[in-house]
Design a protein with these regions (language model features):
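Substrate/cofactor-recognition hotspot
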Residues: 131
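Cys-dependent protein tyrosine phosphatase-like superfamily
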Residues: 2-124, 140-194
Length: 194
């Protein structure tokens, strides 16, 4: 066999392998390429970054979204992608709520938890622009307050979605999450040894 045929065969085999792996990954429900989508709690809470309309269609088809909570700043609210998402929500009977947010304020956290815990609004898809910081913080607080997760487990999940615990600009965000963890831990009865 000539070197050219061998090279052609190897390139074809590599492409075919790549195509098969991509197809397999797209079939798995727990792998979502690049959009930071995940089911936080089945039937209750989903998370992502700002989804494309095709991705939103897929998520809605699979999970029947009832509410979208967009955690956005003033600049992000002006982006055309948001208008397309709002139109999609309107056309599909999905309630669309914008929480203007940088670092979450206590009243915003309360509003978010009230939305998520209202069965009429479930499942709720929450997202910020990149699906990392604001989404990560509110999901961490949800995990701590509603699911009883320890702080470190919630922070580990945030890191798995790209949150940088060492970034100085996020210190106040971490302080807020730690504050919710402290309040939750203080409500747990101390262990007794008999």
């Amino acid at each position: 066999m000539s070197q050219r045929r061998i090279l052609t065969f190897l390139l074809f085999a590599a492409f075919l392998t790549f195509a098969i792996v991509c197809y397999w990954m797209l079939q798995r429900e727990d792998i979502h390429l690049g959009d930071k989508f995940a089911v936080v709690k089945e039937g209750v809470l989903l998370r992502s970054m700002v989804p494309t309309i095709s991705r939103l269609q897929e998520i809605d088809r699979r999970y029947q979204i009832k509410t979208i909570v967009a955690l956005l700043n003033d600049e992000e609210i002006k982006h055309p992608a948001l208008e397309a998402e709002q139109n999609f929500a309107r056309q599909h009977g999905i309630r669309f709520i914008i929480l203007r947010m940088g670092i979450p304020l206590p009243e915003q956290v309360t509003e978010f938890l009230e939305i998520v815990n209202n069965p009429i609004r479930q499942p709720v898809l929450v997202h910020c622009w990149h699906g990392t910081v604001r989404t990560g913080a509110l999901v961490a607080i949800y995990r701590i307050k509603e699911e009883g997760w320890p702080l470190q487990k919630a922070l580990d999940e945030m890191v798995s979605y790209g949150f940088n615990l060492e970034a100085p600009r996020y210190k106040s965000m971490l302080d807020i999450i730690q504050g919710y963890a402290s309040k939750t831990e203080s409500k747990v009865a101390p262990a007794t040894n008999y």
